[in-house]
């Protein structure tokens, strides 16, 4: 089955974007929004060939006439019919491959419910007829892609953030922490604070513009209060941004106020602890003997960790929480936006991994529950 010439497919299903491609590549071939759109008023255009559903970029570009849904919320699949459409689109439209000819590696959120892994397994074998598949935890793949097998991953994407301590390649489930604060919340917060400046962004189309402003202009201050003072005294931090209609807006302290919510969730009216505290709490739930290894290998992963200054700030915050003699190292790999996918590409190309696949035969013999025995 696992012949050298058959390439595995790697599909990382995020709340915001699907990253998909072929094992062995160094980056995903396809990255598109995890959206399914259905026409608001079906059949209104006479003689127009109208599909009953659009996926990804096409749904995004026709968003004016569609109702958009995200089938993955906070990292976990909540709508399986739409999820199936996304996978179908991934294989047939984006990668243009026949899934029945390739082993498929899928990713899942940490602490994904058992029933969900079984459902994924079932859909792959029964709907897409894959010859083999495997489900890997996203944060573990990120750690592999950084060349480590022990460390703590702070993975923050569009829908959810997690801190996942990993020892010798295994995630420690009792110490995993989840924070429902991620990219989408920051985009909404950015809309809110730009509103206070007099820029009204409200529609879902305008939300995409704000997301772009956030991604291009935001950064994380080393010291928030100092930065606020500096921003009052000078206009050095102001940057301008050209909107699609040619208007130009100016963005000032919003540039660092927006992502500051990662460290101070109270900005969003959330009671949760910030990412630094969550990381610390996660480490403290681990055995005292491995904490030193975790503090020395804090690995950032996911699109919401792409802000300039995040590594320095996290180092500073962890240093003040940890014992004074502790050596703290925060690693921010440049490719961390796609590190989950890259880790999957590496893992599924290893010769030692080939016996780990769940094969069609094993599935037919044991049913969906095989996933709990073979993927952990």
Swiss-Prot record:
Q: Lineage from the top down? A: Eukaryota, Sar, Alveolata, Apicomplexa, Conoidasida
Q: Which gene encodes it?
A: ACT1
* Family per record: Belongs to the actin family.
Checking Pfam families in the record gives: Actin (PF00022)
Q: How does it assemble?
A: Component of a complex, at least composed of ald-1, microneme protein MIC2 and ACT1. Interacts (G-actin) with ADF; the interaction results in inhibition of actin polymerization. Interacts (F-actin) with ald-1.
Report the SMART domains cross-referenced here. Answer: ACTIN
Q: Which UniProt keywords apply?
A: ATP-binding, Cytoplasm, Cytoskeleton, Hydrolase, Nucleotide-binding
What is the source species?
Toxoplasma gondii
Domain of life of the organism encoding this protein? Eukaryota
Cite the InterPro entries for this sequence. Answer: Actin (IPR004000), Actin/actin-like_CS (IPR020902), Actin_CS (IPR004001), ATPase_NBD (IPR043129)
Give an example GO molecular function: ATP binding
Q: What protein name does the entry list?
A: Actin
User: Which E.C. number(s) belong to this protein?
Assistant: 3.6.4.-
Q: What class of enzyme is it?
A: hydrolase
Catalytic activity line of the entry: ATP + H2O = ADP + phosphate + H(+)
Primary residence:
cytoplasm
Question: Entry's PROSITE patterns?
Answer: ACTINS_1, ACTINS_2, ACTINS_ACT_LIKE
Q: Which GO terms describe its cellular component?
A: cytoplasm; cytoskeleton
Job of this protein: Actins are highly conserved proteins that are involved in various types of cell motility and are ubiquitously expressed in all eukaryotic cells.
């Amino acid at each position: 089955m696992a012949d050298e010439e058959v390439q595995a497919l790697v599909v990382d299903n995020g709340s915001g974007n699907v990253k998909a491609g072929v094992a062995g590549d160094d980056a995903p071939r396809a990255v598109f929004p995890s959206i399914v759109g259905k026409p608001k008023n079906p059949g209104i255009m006479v003689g127009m060939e109208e599909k009953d559903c659009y996926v990804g970029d096409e749904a995004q570009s026709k968003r004016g006439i569609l109702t958009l849904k995200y089938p993955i919320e906070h990292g976990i699949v909540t709508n399986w019919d739409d999820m199936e459409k996304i996978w179908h689109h991934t294989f047939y439209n984006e990668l243009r491959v026949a899934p029945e000819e390739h082993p498929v590696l899928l990713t899942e959120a940490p602490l994904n419910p058992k029933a969900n892994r079984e459902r994924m397994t079932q859909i792959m074998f029964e709907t897409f007829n894959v010859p083999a598949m495997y489900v890997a935890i996203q944060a573990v793949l990120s750690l592999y892609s950084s060349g480590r097998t022990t460390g703590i991953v702070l993975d923050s994407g569009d829908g959810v953030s997690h801190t996942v301590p990993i020892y010798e390649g295994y995630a420690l489930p009792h110490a995993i922490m989840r924070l429902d604060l991620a990219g989408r919340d920051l985009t909404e917060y950015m809309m809110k604070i730009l509103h206070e400046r007099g820029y009204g962004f409200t529609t879902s189309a305008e939300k995409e513009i704000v997301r772009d402003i956030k991604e291009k202009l935001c950064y994380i201050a080393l010291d928030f209060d100092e930065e606020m003072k500096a921003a009052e005294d000078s206009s050095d931090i102001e940057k301008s941004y050209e909107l699609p209609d040619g208007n130009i807006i100016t963005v000032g302290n919003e540039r660092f106020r927006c992502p500051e919510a990662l460290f101070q969730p109270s900005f969003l009216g959330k009671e949760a602890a910030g990412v630094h505290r969550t990381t610390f709490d996660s480490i403290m739930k681990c055995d005292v003997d491995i904490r030193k290894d975790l503090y020395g290998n804090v690995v950032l992963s996911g699109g919401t960790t792409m802000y300039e200054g995040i590594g320095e700030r996290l180092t500073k915050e962890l240093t003040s929480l940890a014992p004074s003699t502790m050596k703290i190292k925060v690693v921010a790999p440049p490719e961390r936006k796609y590190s989950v996918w890259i880790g999957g590409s590496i893992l599924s190309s290893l010769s030692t991994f080939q016996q780990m696949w769940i094969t069609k035969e094993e599935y037919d013999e044991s049913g969906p529950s095989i996933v709990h025995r073979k993927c952990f």
